[in-house]
Swiss-Prot record:
UniProt record, GO biological process: amino acid biosynthetic process; aromatic amino acid family biosynthetic process; chorismate biosynthetic process
Main enzyme class: lyase
InterPro entries hit by this protein: Chorismate_synth, Chorismate_synth_AroC_sf, Chorismate_synthase_CS
Organism: Bacteroides fragilis (strain ATCC 25285 / DSM 2151 / CCUG 4856 / JCM 11019 / LMG 10263 / NCTC 9343 / Onslow / VPI 2553 / EN-2)
Name of the protein in question: Chorismate synthase
């Protein structure tokens, strides 16, 4: 259950980290959208492993194969099926995990819940599942482009190293110029050096991604239980290793008074706008036409290459030292995943909004 995401635009994903492949079926995608398969592949390449010295060394082409729902380069309105074949599994790296539980992983909870688990690379709980999300998000981005909606995410903090400014203070075109995907070149170098150092110690580190949605029309959101920020929060917190979500000023706004936090309205040549955007583009659970921006915190990767205490499947105390190929920090590869989940959420809520009035 619960392997599907969305209401009208709906992605159902399938597959495991060391199975034959990862795939999905997308229902509710509008007909007539030009499908740029090269763009979809580029998005997957941003997520794939082995991009740099600060990511996992697992080598996968992650080539997407579309199976249905596209004809002569356009969506038909029928379900879009796709698959990405796994090619570089090293399942033997996980033989020592068959009868022990990795600290802070899903091993124990999956075993208790289902009575069985795939110990090879985490199985269904692996972040490799997010391949399906990136494909779905890439298709959603293609549709949103036609509406003038654009989504950009970037690394804004790694461990103690953080960007102090708002997204408006940076040139977001610089995000893809460094492996950390940070728009501040100096901070990016510091972040990269820290990740590399942590990797050398066999440890991991977390941080924060910031995401900005520009061009979102007024009116997206379905109060009271389908508020737009709640939907975005649900989408982000469904990503592996995501631990917290805040939009607008978030917790920072608690330090101010209401008179300081309020986004006052004014008439800008016939268009009602706000002079500030503390609300993060959402008021009353509905988009107000301003930029939507939010932050997602990711914990350090649970797999560390050092000995740790744990228990085996019989509940007996033991120790475990992980092997295999793992990310020392998820943030660089999580950037396209955050964008994908945001894109699918916005497209879904755009389609829902078309049902609000006759």
């Amino acid at each position: 259950m619960f392997n599907s995401f969305g209401n009208i635009f709906r992605l159902t994903s399938f597959g495991e980290s060391h199975g034959k492949g990862i795939g999905g079926v997308i229902d509710g995608f509008p007909a007539g959208i030009v499908i740029d398969e090269e763009f979809v592949q580029q998005e997957l390449s941003r997520r794939r492993p082995g991009q740099s010295v600060i990511t996992t060394s697992r080598k996968e082409a992650d080539k997407v194969e579309f199976l249905s729902g596209i004809f002569e380069g356009k969506s038909t309105g029928c379900p879009i099926g796709f698959i990405v074949w796994n090619e570089n599994q090293h399942s033997n790296d996980y033989n020592n995990l068959e009868k022990v539980y990795r600290p802070s992983h899903a091993d124990y909870t999956y075993t208790v819940k289902y009575g069985i688990r795939d110990h090879r690379g985490g199985g269904r709980s692996s972040a490799r599942e997010t391949i399906s999300r990136v494909v779905g998000g890439a298709l959603a981005k293609l549709a949103l482009r036609q509406l003038g909606i654009h989504i950009t995410a970037y690394t804004s903090q790694v461990g103690p190293i953080k960007l102090e400014g708002n997204y408006t203070d940076y040139d977001l075109d610089l995000i893809e110029t460094n492996p950390v995907r940070c728009p501040d070149p100096e901070k990016a170098k510091e972040m990269q050096d820290l990740i590399y150092k942590i990797k050398g110690e066999g440890d991991t580190i977390g941080g924060v991604l910031t995401c900005v949605i520009k061009g979102c029309p007024i009116g997206l959101g379905q109060p009271v239980y389908g508020k737009l920020h709640a939907a975005l929060g649900n989408a982000m917190l469904s990503i592996n290793a995501a631990k917290a979500f805040e939009y607008g000023d978030g917790f920072k706004g608690l330090k101010q008074k209401g008179s300081e936090q309020n986004d006052v309205f004014y008439n800008n040549n016939g268009r009602i706008e706000t002079r500030t955007n503390h609300s993060g583009g959402i008021q009353g659970g509905i988009s107000n036409g301003q930029d939507i921006f939010f932050r997602v915190a990711f914990k350090p990767v649970a797999t560390v290459l050092m000995e740790q205490e744990t228990v085996n499947i019989d509940g007996i105390d033991t120790t475990l030292k992980a092997r295999g190929r793992h990310d020392p920090c998820v943030l660089p590869r999580a950037v396209p995943i955050v964008e994908a989940m945001a894109a699918m959420t916005i497209l879904d809520y755009y389609l829902l909004d078309r049902m609000t009035q006759l």
